[in-house]
Amino acid sequence: MYSFCLDNRHSKGFAYIDYSEEKAIATLYQKHNIPFIIDLWNRYYEDHIWGLEELENAQRDMMAYMSVTDYDMNSKEEREQMYLIYKLIAIVSYAIFHQRSLVGSGD
């Protein structure tokens, strides 16, 4: 599982990637060249802090993958990838909205 919080490593996480979503993130990592996903997957079992500039770039990069036309909606695996993109955009956007860095913590 991977948890996200704003700024402080010791604060309670506001969002999580659970074990059931790991397959979707691994597939996105393999299929697409999305720097935030690559960084997240490479640091999945570590703690990491993304600054505002990185988050703004991540938001822009992932927005390109939001359209349902990019996915086969008959495929459960592709729907899960799309939902994870939506979730990650929401997580990143939340941090940007609050103008705070995003701390990820793997366990």
Where are these regions (language model features)?
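Acidic (Asp/Glu-rich) sequence patches and key acidic residues
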Residues: 1-107
